From Swiss-Prot:
Record text on cofactor binding: Binds 1 heme b (iron(II)-protoporphyrin IX) group per dimer.
Gene: katG
Subunit structure, as described in the record: Homodimer or homotetramer.
Cross-referenced PROSITE patterns: PEROXIDASE_1 (PS00435), PEROXIDASE_2 (PS00436), PEROXIDASE_4 (PS50873)
UniProt-listed PANTHER family: CATALASE-PEROXIDASE (PTHR30555:SF0), HYDROPEROXIDASE I, BIFUNCTIONAL CATALASE-PEROXIDASE (PTHR30555)
CC terms in the record's Gene Ontology section: cytosol
Enzyme class: oxidoreductase
Protein's name according to its UniProt entry: Catalase-peroxidase
SS bond list: none
Residue positions binding heme b: H260
Source organism: Polaromonas sp. (strain JS666 / ATCC BAA-500)
Disordered: region residues: 1-24, 339-365
Numbered residues of crosslink Tryptophyl-tyrosyl-methioninium (Trp-Tyr) (with M-245): W96-Y219
GO molecular function: catalase activity; heme binding; metal ion binding
Length: 731
């Protein structure tokens, strides 16, 4: 038998990792997906660590960009001709589909990162031919380079498209930074077939956190639920999916009517003529997909959704003709040339009133989607639609505001908005916080306040738990939540089970007394906000706990938070931030105990934590006795409220044998191997740091005999990160 290596250029060349060997996830599909904690690092980012997009964007001549985009709108290209001689409707669809993936439940999706450039979104069935829209934008992106992200450009192009067709938009903010690899943390559904809908159970109950009815769609099936052309049933789907994007009925009607004022859908022929999506297309396609063999494959022969609908007689001009047509005709079911279910005026009504997108010698009748008929046949939608029809100015205002909300919902607070086009009006969904209007506390004040807090009778665990509860609502997905605003004292957060309302009220009462006493004793307008005081209390407690462990540390603290009012807090909007589980506080709602480890990783990802940061925080918070309800699960120490590495030392102690509790779901018992004596109890969240090989490797670092100092150092750094997650003013 020959031992000579195969020639690397022969057909028997060895395969390498990039050729697609089975991954660990293929072998063990149920293992924790810790990779979601290490996305978008400097290793995948070509811009360099010194790159500051906000500064680059501020130097951008936005009016020049808009001028270039305006010229592009009517500069039709032979390789992808513009419908009606205008690319505006295509760019509106691109921007809408970039933003429309947002779901309020976990804040993921949305337009904030330019993720439409990558799989799976770039290849979703609902995004057919949006690859062409981005290629049309490439000369603009190429011209302005690092000053203008793809994420901002896609939304700006949608705005300019609307303005170029006579619509006045509400405004535009830049500040969206591009990612450079696909997102691994977003759960788009369990289906492995496009347009499948295993996400439903019971009486059409849509799985959380999903915001679309089928795999690969943005919202709903335009033909109706599973292709059933029932406008009333479709209205139910519309209402559910738009609500999951934080839109009410009026905003929903405005968005559908406003968007469908422009452009058309494409179903010139059978979809069997359409080639594979971009991620499956051949290398010669250079990232484009859906190459069609029907006729020319473009222009009048374009196939996208399979539906062939033009709603308005003026598809490149803002107006009220969408509602004129919706209410002006009686509608009957028909099929597109591709066989898709759609609606036409009964008889020959409306014939010749709608222009052809590419042949000026042809005219057509208007058409509607099943989901358009929902706006006429659903009683609540109809009432709004008729009001908009009779009051076009109300439609224009509602659409402008809803479009702005759609395209900016995941950008976070107003302080992150960049550029001269940011509207002055502050909106409730932006979670407003008052601007700093007083002199901030200095180092001497901070030291005095710490002393007062620690002498107040509040325990280390009370102070730590309250600060954590205030800060840990932050979501990096849509930049909501966090300690700024002190909304933990307001509804709904003050009533959340995880925040232990009765205990929280006691802590807040004492902190408010300290705040009042301090502020009343000051001159020159100096004040401390309760938001700052809550965080400072946690920092003081961490320092005290470290001192008990024999280490003097100074936990960083940056004043400047302000206190929001109840009027500035939308209770329903903030309700979605309530955690079903918070493994850092060893909390999970009943029934979720078995998936607590996965929920911990999900929360850590939303808080932008790495696996090492998550690990050290768990160990520290257990030592600080910060569990909900003062539960002893995972408090593997004989000296609670002392910042030691005991959690890791005792978790990895081989003299302890672990077994599942016979009486408590999700709880394990650690017993002495020799005597059987019960030593500790822990949850799945605690024990996963010993069972998962990657987390055990991290736990071992902090369990070593020389790791106490590094443990405290790393805990303080991670704690400081969490306390400042929403301090965009410090960046």
């Amino acid at each position: 038998m020959s031992t000579e290596p195969n020639c690397p250029f022969s057909g028997n060349a060895r395969k390498h990792t990039a050729a697609g060997a089975p991954s660990n996830a293929d072998w063990w599909p149920n293992q924790l997906k810790l990779n979601i904690l290490h996305q978008h690092s400097a290793m995948s980012d070509p811009m360099g660590e010194a790159f500051n997009y906000a500064q680059e964007f501020k130097s951008l001549d936005l009016e020049a960009v808009k001028k270039d985009l305006l010229a592009l709108m009517t500069n039709s290209q032979d390789w992808w001709p513009a419908d009606f001689g205008h690319y505006g409707p295509l760019f509106i669809r691109m921007a809408w589909h970039s933003a429309g993936t947002y779901r309020v439940s976990d804040g993921r999706g949305g337009a904030g990162s330019g993720n439409q450039r990558f799989a799976p979104l770039n290849s979703w069935p609902d995004n057919v031919n949006l690859d062409k829209a981005r290629r049309l934008l490439w000369p603009v992106k190429q011209k302005y380079g690092r000053k203008l992200s793809w994420a901002d450009l896609m939304i700006l192009a949608g705005n300019v498209a609307l303005e170029s067709m006579g619509f006045k938009t509400f405004g535009f903010a830049g500040g969206r930074e591009d990612i450079w690899e696909p997102e691994e943390d977003v759960y788009w559904g369990s289906e492995n077939t496009w347009l499948d809908d295993k996400r439903y159970s019971g009486d059409r109950d849509l799985e959380n956190p999903l915001g679309a009815v089928q795999m690969g769609l943005i919202y709903v099936n335009p033909e109706g639920p599973n292709g059933n052309p029932d406008p009333i049933a479709a209205a139910r789907d519309i209402r559910e999916t738009f609500a999951r994007m934080a839109m009410n009925d009026e905003e929903t009607v405005a968005l559908i009517a406003g968007g469908h004022t422009f452009g058309k859908t494409h179903g010139a022929g059978d979809v069997k003529h359409v080639g594979p999506e971009p991620e499956a297309a051949g290398i010669e396609e250079q990232g484009l997909g859906w190459n069609s063999g029907f006729g020319t494959g473009k222009g009048g022969d374009t196939i996208s959704s399979g539906l062939e609908v033009t709603w308005s007689t003026t598809p490149t001009k803002w107006g009220n003709n969408y509602f004129d047509n919706l209410f002006g005709y009686e509608w009957e079911l028909t099929t597109s040339p591709a066989g898709a279910q759609q609606w036409k005026p009964k008889g020959d009504a409306g014939a010749g009133t709608v222009p052809d997108a590419h042949d000026p010698s042809k005219r057509h009748a208007p058409a509607m989607l099943t989901t358009d008929l929902s706006l006429r046949l659903d009683p609540a939608y109809e009432k709004i639609s008729r009001r908009f029809h009779e009051n076009p100015d109300q439609l224009a205002d509602a659409f402008a505001r809803a479009w702005f909300k759609l395209t900016h919902r995941d950008m976070g607070p107003l302080s992150r908005y960049l550029g001269p086009l940011v509207p002055k009006e502050q909106l409730l969904w932006q979670d407003p916080i008052p601007a700093v209007d007083h002199k901030l506390v200095d180092e001497q004040d901070i030291a005095a306040l710490k002393t007062r807090i620690l002498a107040s009778g509040l325990s280390i665990s009370q102070l730590v738990t309250t600060a954590w509860a205030s800060a840990a609502t932050f979501r990096g997905s849509d930049k909501r939540g966090g300690a700024n605003g002190a909304r933990i004292r307001l509804a709904p957060q003050k009533n959340w089970e995880v925040n232990q309302p009765a205990e929280l009220a006691k802590v807040l009462q004492k902190l408010e007394t300290i705040q009042k006493d301090f502020n009343s004793a000051q001159s020159g307008g100096k004040k401390v906000s309760l938001a700052d005081l809550i965080v400072l209390g946690g920092c003081a407690a961490v320092e005290a706990a470290a001192k008990k462990a024999g280490q003097d540390v100074k936990v960083p603290f940056s004043p400047g938070r302000m206190d929001a009012s109840q009027e500035q807090t939308d209770v329903d909007s903030f309700a979605v931030l309530e955690p079903a589980a918070d493994g850092f506080r060893n909390y999970a709602r009943k029934g979720l105990e078995g998936s607590a480890a996965e929920l911990l990783v999900d929360k850590a990802q939303l808080m932008t934590l790495t696996a090492p940061e998550m690990t050290v925080l768990i160990g520290g918070l257990r030592a600080l006795n910060a569990n909900v309800g003062q539960s002893k699960h995972g408090v593997f120490t004989k000296q609670p409220e002392t910042l030691t590495n005991d959690f890791f030392v005792n978790l990895l102690d081989m003299s302890t044998k672990w077994q599942k509790s016979a009486t408590s779901e999700g709880v394990l018992e650690g017993r002495d191997r020799a005597t059987g004596e019960l030593k500790w109890t822990g949850t799945i969240v605690d024990l996963v740091f010993g069972s998962n090989s990657q987390l055990r490797a991290l736990a071992e670092v902090y369990a070593c005999s020389d790791s106490q100092k590094s443990f405290v150092r790393d805990f303080v750094a991670a704690w400081n990160k969490v306390m400042n997650l929403d301090r965009f003013d410090l960046a």
